[in-house]
């Protein structure tokens, strides 16, 4: 079995790392370069940077931040937020990103995913899906895709959208439960399982990690290939090394 990845996530707005609850109530968490360096030293497998207001604010890419981080951090960087064109993908890769995450722009123009993967390869295109449960209690579970930092409903079914994006060449799906984001109540394992079972590419579970058991559950019960977290790492509750040691004790293969 391939090693499972632990990925700290840095949500960035106006050049600072922030963390919210249910995509709002943002709280400052520090300088992105310092935080990224810390996670590199702790043994993170990758780092994900998301400019969470670039699309809704119509802002350009955070190239200078990525250049600064890439010069000091030597693990893969995934970067998203405000990516609208294949040219944007090129600019971020040139700045030092290893993978590019697209979200709102993939929904506005699904061909972007096809074109970007054709030019740069599936391995560096990640489609981020922000999903909120739309089914009532007792109904078959359904989740709707939201865009623009969780502010805009699309009417799209999250599982079907993940299937389409994988078919268009996306190399990974970054799946965030909006219902669990920042709540520390654990992943939406039903959502994670539904998408993981539906697509032939790796799924990164995101949204809701409150402790180390939640990370392990994302792999063992959610069937994710990687787990992403922010709050438990940003505020010193746990280190990445502690998370890896816990997962190894649970019998999950990780790179120590």
Swiss-Prot record:
Protein name according to UniProt: Imidazole glycerol phosphate synthase subunit HisF
Pathway membership: Amino-acid biosynthesis; L-histidine biosynthesis; L-histidine from 5-phospho-alpha-D-ribose 1-diphosphate: step 5/9
E.C. no: 4.3.2.10
Pfam annotation, one family: His_biosynth
Primary localization class, coarse: cytoplasm
Gene behind the chain: hisF
BP terms from Gene Ontology: L-histidine biosynthetic process
InterPro entries for this protein: Aldolase_TIM, His_biosynth, HisF, IGPS_HisA/HisF, RibuloseP-bd_barrel
Source organism, top-level taxon: Bacteria
